[in-house]
Amino acid sequence: MKKILIVEGNLREENQSFTDGGIKTHTESLKDSIAYFTDKIETDVVNPSSDKNISEKVVDLEKYDGLIWGGSSLNIYSDTIEIRRQIEFMRECQKKIKKILAICWGLQVAVTVAGGQVKRCTNGSHRGICLLYTSPSPRDQRGSRMPSSA
């Protein structure tokens, strides 16, 4: 059985407000989605911003076949202890887990740890579908549009 670590990006207080409003957290939705498609994946959840025992998880990262780092209302431009804790945890994950799916906030953290730059959107926040641009090197700022067949 495959073992996946799911990282919760939101602060515990924000997740509580979702729960109080009858809305699933991002992590709960991810777990439900995985369970819908297969029962052959075991998941663990960690919240680097709120979990006091996060150092225990760092020691065991090699046991995971992959990692899913979900979204959050946070942004990489704020300098808070919670964000710094997530950046440090991602740094350890990138050393020890080879297969990482980073979604929205998770991608901001992953790019920052890898030495890339996340640029602030000049047209306000974006949600939904958009064109995806790739570059041959993380340092190449030009990029190119992915073929529509991708």
Locate predicted features.
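N-terminal beta1-alpha1 cap of cysteine-dependent amidohydrolase-like domains
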Residues: M1-E88, E92-K96
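Conserved residues at the C-terminal ends of beta-strands
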Residues: G70, Q141-S144
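Cysteine-nucleophile active-site neighborhood
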Residues: G70-L132
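Conserved small/polar residues in nucleotide/adenosyl-binding loops
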Residues: Y133-D140
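Hydrophobic alpha-helical segments, chiefly the membrane-spanning helices
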Residues: S144-A150
